[in-house]
Amino acid sequence: MRKFVANLLAVLFATCVVAAPRPKNVILVIGDGMGPSHVTAARWIRGDKLQFLRMPVTGLVATFSADDAVTDSAASASAYATGMKTNNRALSVDANGNPRKTVLEVANESGKATGVITTTDFWDATPAAFLSHSKDRYDDARSIVQQIVSGKADVVLGGGSDLLGKGSFPSLAELKKSDRVVVTSRAELEATKARRVLGVFNTQPNDTEDPDAPLWVLTKWAIGKLSADPDGFFLLIENEGIDTASHNHHSDDVAKALTEYDEALRVVLDFAAARRDTLVIAVGDHETGGLDICCEGGEDKGWRMEWSTPDHTGAAIPLFAFGPGSQSFAGYIDNTDVGKKLLSFVRK
């Protein structure tokens, strides 16, 4: 009898696992450099409007790379993109330099629409890890740009217009010779009906959002376009300003970038809550600045940001999840686990 009950429970458990809903759409929202104290700061800044409060599943993510206890953005984004560790500076290749398929590439193979949005140069480490392959992000910039422009992502939106045509970077005129429609303003973006779009906007100080093309606006536009695909979509959204401002210890711009991130996340969660077929993951890629939140003291009980380093740290980072499949991200996991789960959800 005991054996029968055990077997029955095993069958029931297996049935539940198989029957667990799979997301049609997957949206990964990365706050570059966003560690535990950044999340604490965001709670003070946003109060009850903080979008993480809408996400019932939480986790903690280990971030070390293949060759260092402290990752850089290239290696950490590659772990999310491929489910494998790589060396710092490398983009979606293994530790031996062999290219590995990214979640965006697998989503394309599965017939899904795909897109990437960032507040920094569109070929920077995090977007590039999902869109290209390179042994060294710093020695291969022109190739990375060419891979992104000729790649299969339907939508690529980011900064970098000020660098085009300088050094090894192609000019805007060269980019316009590709099969993509290239836009450089919000008005041009909202007017285009093209299937393949490259938006190149102005990169701002500390990589905060372009006021002409705020991150939440780009997010709303991209979701509207990609969600028309009957097979679903994969979308990466990154706010780079959290990282850059943390490197520079510019607390005001950190607060600004956290607000921008939260406003974009609001757009994502509003979409996901209405649809109930969309997995949303909100997470950093590593911690930057050794941030701590300290009390000002006095009657106002204020707070301030204090910094211990201009560099990245090895701190584990918070993860928040919403939607079908979100429970699989609970607990203490590795950044490669995030990538493996994302890959499993976009495969046919």
Q: What do the PLM-derived regions correspond to, one by one?
A:
Residues 1-8:
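Bacterial N-terminal signal peptides that target proteins for export
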Residues 10-19:
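Hydrophobic h-region of N-terminal signal peptides that target proteins for export
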Residues 20-165, 171-189, 195, 287-348:
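N-terminal catalytic scaffold of extracellular/periplasmic and nuclease hydrolases
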Residues 28, 157, 199-201, 234-238, ...:
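Structural motif
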Residues 36, 259-298:
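Metal-dependent active-site segment of extracytoplasmic phospho-/sulfohydrolases and closely related
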Residues 125-131, 203-206, 222-223, 227-267:
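Active-site His/acidic residue clusters
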Residues 137, 211-219, 257-261, 338:
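Phosphate/oxyanion-binding active-site loops and adjacent basic polyanion-contact surfaces
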Residues 183, 212-227:
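A Trp-anchored, charged/polar loop motif used as the substrate-binding/catalytic surface
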